[in-house]
Amino acid sequence: MKLPIYFDYSATTPVDKRVAEKMMQYMTNDGHFGNPASRSHKFGWQAEEAVDIARNQIAELINADPREIVFTSGATESNNLAIKGAANFYNKKGKHIITCKTEHKAVLDTCRELERQGFEVTYLDPEENGLIDLNKLNDAMRDDTILVSIMQVNNEIGVIQDISEIGEMCRARKIVFHVDAAQSAGKINIDMQALKVDLMSISAHKMYGPKGIGALYVSRKPRIRLEAQTHGGGHERGMRSGTLATHQIVGMGEACRLAKEEMAQDQAHVTAMRDRLWAGLNSMEQVFINGDADKRYPGNLNVSFNFVEGESLIMALKDLAVSSGSACTSASLEPSYVLRALGLNDEMAHSSIRFSFGRFTTTEEIDYAIELIKGAIGHLRDMSPLWEMFKDGIDLDSIEWAAH
């Protein structure tokens, strides 16, 4: 067993060796390195064929038409293109957008930018379990609402939103519905023929593909129009100009093919890993799961350890690659905005750790982690006067702290 142990699959996944081998065939002089847009010679035709195959593999993963797949540099760009592109195209109908406070920053910051441009955004509060109350969403919808953007699986707490029902609500009101599926594509079953979703963002590096490549699903029936955010050679049906990165696209296609083939065993594996870790951690006092216990992706376990300071806990667990909050905001010492939105106080939000598992996690690693965490928690709590008071039965909320 190698240290440190990687428990941060929600931040990124290692590229599957089978994916890397496929990518290598499209980079060097002895491979198919041509530009897919070069229509006048064999090098271009070979690259174009590889892109077409990958486009089909991505479409098959989510049961979509390959013509509905637009390549981007990743889910952040897909989110920007979907939200800004739809808002700019449909702004004659209205300027109201609805999203949720626990969305990824790539959605929230994009909405903030649109607010600066004169759009109005409603940020829904989630319930304590991290899920959206659909009645509150319905109440927020107005005649001038043009777009709803809700993620499928939350990157920090792993809860799964009911995008099927939200899609029905949006379609009934003729509102464009965008879903950030960065954390769900390739991990849970997605059927675009059954879902009333207009736009969906997908990332390769969350499902054992390369970084720097993603896709945006853009519905053809009903036809969704976007205003391009990148201008140039008119690639991707004018929606996203730029030379297609054949090797990365091939990698994403292969990652999607493997994800579809191995989804059942991947799900069973991460569920077993999650259950084993939780069984070990749950034997301690004052340990809580954040987010709904049932409606969640099994590869994510977000846990708060009461009476322990989060920074010191992460330092004590230096042999475990875990995170507090998302990778995109983990550099800040602010408590997670997602956990705060759930109603956790600063102390509980600060003492939370996100464990995320994947294809290469082993039971040996889980067992090592359990013992390490138990030891670290015990040591840190022994130093905590609050823990001592709690053990003595003192209600900490009743204490009046002296101001210094």
Curated annotation (Swiss-Prot):
Active site positions: 328 (cysteine persulfide intermediate)
Record SUPFAM superfamilies: PLP-dependent transferases
Domain of life where this protein originates: Bacteria
Binding site for [2Fe-2S] cluster: 328
Entry similarity comment: Belongs to the class-V pyridoxal-phosphate-dependent aminotransferase family. NifS/IscS subfamily.
Physiological role: Master enzyme that delivers sulfur to a number of partners involved in Fe-S cluster assembly, tRNA modification or cofactor biosynthesis. Catalyzes the removal of elemental sulfur atoms from cysteine to produce alanine. Functions as a sulfur delivery protein for Fe-S cluster synthesis onto IscU, an Fe-S scaffold assembly protein, as well as other S acceptor proteins.
Name of the protein in its database record: Cysteine desulfurase IscS
Organism of provenance: Colwellia psychrerythraea (strain 34H / ATCC BAA-681)
Biological classification of the source: Bacteria, Pseudomonadati, Pseudomonadota, Gammaproteobacteria, Alteromonadales
